[in-house]
Amino acid sequence: MTDASNVCSNPDCRVAQLGTCHLDHDPVDSCPHYGSREAADLDPGEIEELSAPVERTMDGIELRSNKVIPESGITNFRNRVRAKTIVLAGEQKTGKTTLLAALYGMFCKGPVGEFEFVSSQTLYSFAERKHLALFDPERSVPVTPRTSRGDDVNFFHIKMKAGDNLSEIVISDRSGEAFEDARLDTALVAKLSELALADRVCFLLDAARLTKKETRPGYSRIFKQAIRSLLDNDAVPKSAVLEVLVTKFDRVSDGQDGLNPLQDLEQYEQELRDEFGASGYEFEIHRICVDFH
C-alpha cells in the first residue's frame, strides 16, 4: 500500500491506510495537500539534460562512452596516456574514414604485422564505422559515411603490443573539406589544430584518381599543393614523420592505349621523394588497399 507521505504533505493524514481524507475532503484529490509532496519531489528537468551523457556512472564507477575523443578532450587524454599521435590528412573521398574502419577490422581478425590488439578507449566508434562500411551487402566496394565539414576533429585510440612492448596511438579524423579549404586559403591552416600534436602526418594519395588520364594533371598538382600549404606555414612539427599513403591501389587498372598507370604512379612517387624528402622531414611512401573480407 502507498505510504501517505508519498501522496500527502499533511503528516497526520492516513489516506493511504483508510482511503479517506483527514480534513474530510471528498473526493480526496480535492484536498490541497493531496499529491503535493509527490509533485514537489518530481524533477521537471530540461530537454538538454535528457540527452545521453558522454560518461555514465554505475554503482559509483564512472564508465567511458568508448566513443571518439573530441578535440576538447585530447590534451587531457595525452597527459594521462603516453600515445603517439597520427594525423590523417587528405581531401574529400581519399579514404580516411574507410582506412580507420579497415584498421579496426584487421585487428578483429588478428595481429596486424607484428602488432596485436590490446584495447581501445574508442571501441564503440571503431565498431560503428566498420558496421556502416559493411551495412549494404549489395555494394561491391566498402563505403563509409564521410566526416562532415561541420564536425570538429576527433581522435581514435588503439593500445597494442609487439612482443612484450606495449604502445598506444591516437589517430585524427577530420573532414576532407577542411584540408581543401586550408589549401585554398592558408589562413585556415592554423585551424588544423591536430597538426601541432603530430608524431606522424599521413597524406592520403588517391591512386585511382592519379592514374586516370582525365584527372591526373589537376590531381597531381593539387596533392603537392596540399602538402606544401602545411609545410610552408610551419603547421607540422619538425620532429614529425611525413608519410604518403597511396590508397585505392587495388583500383589501378592495367595499361591500355599505350598508358602505363603503374609506371605513372612510380614516377609520381619519385617526384614526391625528390621534392619533400629534402624538406628537412623524414619522408616515407607506402601503398595500401582496404580489405573488409
Outline where the language-model segments fall.
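Glycine-rich phosphate-binding P-loop
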Residues: 84-109
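Switch II (G3) loop of P-loop NTPases
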Residues: 164-189
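Canonical P-loop GTPase G-domain recognition
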Residues: 243, 249-293
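Long, basic/Gly/Ser/Thr-rich N-terminal segments
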Residues: 1-62
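Pre-Walker A adenine-sensing motif
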Residues: 66-79
